[in-house]
Amino acid sequence: MFRSQRMKFLELVVLERDVDRVLEYLGKTALVHLRLSAAARGSSSHCAQSKEYVGRLEEACKYLGVSGECAFSPGDSLPTEEDYTLAQQILAEVDALHAREREGDAPSVPRGKSSVAHDSANEEQFQGEKCALGSMRGPALCALLRRFALQERVHRTRDALESTRHTYRIAGWLPAHEAKDLVAGLDNVTTGRMAVRLFEPQELSFIRDGSEHVPVCYQHGRFVRSYERMVSSYGCPPYGLVDPTPFVAFSYALLFGIMFGDLGQGLLFFVLGLLLRTRRVRALNRWAHLDYVFLSVGFSSMVMGFLTGEFFAHGTLLAPLIRSVTALCGGVPRDHILHLMPSHGSLHTLMAFFGFTLFLGFVINSLGLIINIVNQVRLRHALQQCVQKRECADSSFFGTWLPLQCAYHFLEFHSGSLMRLQWACLSWVFFVKSFWSVCASVCVRGFLKVLACI
C-alpha cells in the first residue's frame, strides 16, 4: 500500500499475422505500458486505409444525425471481412442519398415559374429518408465506427514497433504479479507462436545508466485512489520509494474537518460526493474521480461541526439535538460537545484543542521528514541526507519542541510561572533551529570539500 507495485519488463516477439490481435489483447487488459521505438516508421497502407474508413464513417454519422461517439466497450473487436462488406454497403447507401440530395438542391426552374413548393416537398422527402436510414443503420454504423477506430489505433501502434520482415517486437512494463496471467493469455491468443522474456529492472542497461526510469504503478483502494491526482500534481514519487498518497488522503481529510468544521457545509460536500459517486448528473462526470475526496472531507467536516455545534455558521441551531445526545450518553446536557468559542470556562477546552492541533501538525511534519529520510536511504543518498542542513534544522526543531512542550504542560500544572516558561521554550526552540541551520551548512560545505580533495 505504501510503495508502488513491483514492475517487470516484458519483451515479446510475435509473427506479423498475430500482431494485431496481440495489440488488441494488450489494449483491453490495460496492463502493459508499451515502450515504443523512438524512430517510428511512417504510416503504413493499412493504417491509412483504417483512417480513411474512420473518416468516412464519421461523415456518415454526422450526415444522418447519429451520435458517433468512440467510447470503446469490452465487447468491441477488430473488424472482420463481414464488417468491411457491411461498411461499404452502408457508405454506398449514404453516398447515394447524399448525391440525390445535391441534385435536388439545384433544379431547373422555368422562366416565370416558382419552385418553392417543389423544393419544400423535396426537402421533406429527403429528411424523411435520412431519418429512416439513420434509424435503420444507426446502431450498426456506431459499432462499425468503434471497430475501425480500434483498428486505426492498433495499426498506429504497430507502426511504432520494432520489426523485421515477418516478426514484431513488443516491449513494455507491467506489474510483476500480473505477468503470469498475461503471458498465459498471450499464449492463448497466438496459440503458442511467440517468444517472451521477463526482466527485472536491475537487469536492463538503460535503467542502470539512468537514461530511462521505471514507470510507477500504484494499487490503491477507492478512497486513496481519489487523492492520486492531487499528489501527482506535485510530482510522482520515483519507482520503489515510499508512496505518500495514503498519508495525504488521511491528513487532508482530517485537517479539512478541523479547519472547516460545519455540519451544514460538510453535508453539502458529502451530497456532492454522492452525486459524483452515482454519476447521476452528467455535467459532473468529468470530476467523478474526486468522489471520495468530497465524501471524506464532507464527513470529516460534518463530524467536527457536530462536535462544535456549528450549522451554516450558526452555533445555536443544533443545541437541542446536542443536549439530547449528551443526556443520552449519561452526562449533563450541554449545548456544545466541544465549546471552542470564548466564554466563561471554555479557555481550558480551547487551549487543549489548540495543543491537539499543534501535536497533529508535529506528527504530520515528522511523518514527512521520516518518509523523506527513508526515500533518500533507498536512493543511496543516506550520507547526504544525514548532513543536509535543512533536514538537520527541521529535525532538531521538531525533536526539541515535543519534550519542551511536555515539560511546559507538566510545570503548568504544578507552578504559576507559565508565561515566562512559554516564552523561554519558544526562544530556545527557534534558537536551536537557527543554530543547527548555520552549523549544518558549515559542516556540509566542509565535508564536501574534504571529499573533493580525497
From Swiss-Prot:
InterPro entries: V-ATPase_116kDa_su. Pfam families: V_ATPase_I (PF01496). Its main location: membrane. It is a multi-pass membrane protein. Keywords: Cell membrane, Hydrogen ion transport, Ion transport, Membrane, Transmembrane, Transmembrane helix, Transport. GO terms for cellular component: plasma membrane; proton-transporting V-type ATPase, V0 domain; vacuolar proton-transporting V-type ATPase complex. GO terms for biological process: vacuolar acidification. It is found in: Cell membrane. Residues 101-121 are annotated as: Disordered. It comes from the Bacteria. GO terms for molecular function: ATPase binding; proton-transporting ATPase activity, rotational mechanism. The chain crosses the membrane at residues 254-274, 293-313, 351-371, 424-444. Belongs to the V-ATPase 116 kDa subunit family. Produces ATP from ADP in the presence of a proton gradient across the membrane. This is V-type ATP synthase subunit I 2. It comes from Treponema pallidum (strain Nichols). The lineage of its organism: Bacteria, Pseudomonadati, Spirochaetota, Spirochaetia, Spirochaetales.
